[in-house]
Amino acid sequence: MPDRVTRIALDVDGTLSGYGGIIDKWTIGEFLKTAHVGIVSTRGDCHNVASEFGLGYACCAGVDKPTKADCLRDYAQKYPVNGGSLYIADTPHDFTQALNAGWNFADANHLRLNLGAGGDIHTGVVNIDARLLPNIDIVRDLEKDPIPFPDGTVQFIVMKDFLEHLSWRKVAGFMKQVYNKLKSGGWVFIQSPDMDAIYHSIIEKRDFHGDFKYRFETISYWVGGGQDYPENTHKAFFTIDTIHELLKDIGFSQTYCRNDNTNFQCIAKK
């Protein structure tokens, strides 16, 4: 557990939790919105001021309050949320760092799965992929074979750049399987290409990333996948609205989705 991540004991009845992501890009409004899903995670600085959720809260340590802990307590008192635990990180984390730090600190005994892991390996998580790669725990083609764990036993499932590689005809059934594998109160994280954002970029002739020029290879890559090995082809396509509707139809009790450049990110709680 990194020393820079510290649990803050809140002096309020209800504790607060949230998903940090790349902290300096997440507003307080987004942070609070994800807290309703009950995700243990991180929040780092005093510059995340939101208007889109009508909160408009800012607290800078040493200015508005003596310490960062005082800021967080004040925030929790003003916006109480039924959730898990609140964490603070002095150094911004990327998504996977925040995710792993929060969950490892909260309860290392939870069964956690990383589906379609590829080279994105996490510790304390069962990493599953269709290919035999370094540090993959289970080799399984999840488009053909079921998730190899009993129903109701998994606390947390990550599907980062995975769902789009399944046939669109199988996505709904697969997500129902994911739902069934989760414990009550378990949750899933999904990252996938955001077709709405990609198509707007194409129409407006905007560059997708700083390291790409606007050309047919760029469009083909973001829509169709890398296609450098058989499994790396996109076969299902989503927008934030359609993935949100799918999760709702399957039965997830709470969902939150946001755009992240050419991708969307969703968290959903069973």
Enumerate the language-model features and the residues they cover.
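S-adenosyl-L-methionine-dependent methyltransferase catalytic module, highlighting the catalytic core
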Residues: W168-K270
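A short helix->loop->beta-strand "cap" motif at the edges of active sites that frequently abuts
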Residues: A35, W103, G186
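Local beta-strand N-terminus motif with an aromatic residue
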Residues: V5, Y57, V81-G84, V154
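Acidic, Mg2+-coordinating phosphoryl-transfer loop and its flanking beta/alpha structural elements
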Residues: L86-L111
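Conserved Lys-Pro-Asp/Glu-containing loop-to-beta segment of HAD-superfamily phosphomonoesterases
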Residues: K68-H93
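Conserved SAM-binding loop
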Residues: L113-I198, C266-K270
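Conserved beta-strand elements of the Class I
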Residues: I8-A9, L86, L111-L113, V126
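Alpha-helical substrate-recognition element adjacent to the catalytic core
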Residues: M1-P66
